[in-house]
Amino acid sequence: MLRKAVPKGVPVAADPPTSELALRPLGFEHLAAVLDLGHRVYDTDAMPYTGWSLTAVAGHLDAPNSACLVTLDGDRVAGFVLGSLSFEQRADWGYLEWIAVDPDYQGRKVASRLVQECCARLAEAGAVCVVTDVERRNTASAELMRRNGFTERATVSLFVRPLAEPAPADGATARDTAASRRHFTRAAERIR
């Protein structure tokens, strides 16, 4: 679910950006900003699988046929998309895995440009279609996908069963479940 406001302590631009935005391939130099933006924009407490680890994002840099891009305003990451060729057992399907746009840049077609370029790169790599998943309450992302040619094909529910953990016998503290949630990743690591 997208957050409505920027958390306290996160710097925001005083005025809306006015410069020309550049679309570039995701590079190592963008990793920290991509993770920061993704975690600022998505509420990972509501939907834990919307969060990514550094390892998961960095893994895309070495992947063949990667369709991972950033939109830059100078050196500032205004938005990003992570896409890959293969979805579950379908090597001919592309997967638009994660997209986020800084609130300062929303309304400037940054997300649509990222979606279109990601899909074009996946098509060039041999994808016959591109799939993505959108949380039911994330109406802004659902509308973005519809505007860019996606149609709803299936509904999937995330079922969660909390498990009680016994207290450790050696006096050690129980594992940090919040840390576990932060490192819970999406389908790419979940299935492979």
Residue ranges and their predicted role:
Residues V101, G107-A120, E143, R147:
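Conserved acetyl-CoA-binding loop-helix of GNAT-fold acetyltransferases
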Residues P25-E97, D102, V115-Q116, R121, ...:
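Acetyl-CoA-dependent GNAT
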Residues L122-V134:
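Conserved GNAT acetyl-CoA-binding A-motif
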Residues Q106, T132-A142, V160:
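Conserved beta-strand-loop-alpha-helix junction that forms the acyl-donor binding cleft
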Residues S112, R136-T155:
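Conserved active-site alpha-helix within GNAT-family acetyltransferase domains
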Residues L2-K4, N148-A167:
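Active-site/acyl-donor-binding loops of N-acyltransferases
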Residues M1-E29, E165-R192:
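Conserved N-terminal entry element of GNAT/NAT acetyltransferase domains
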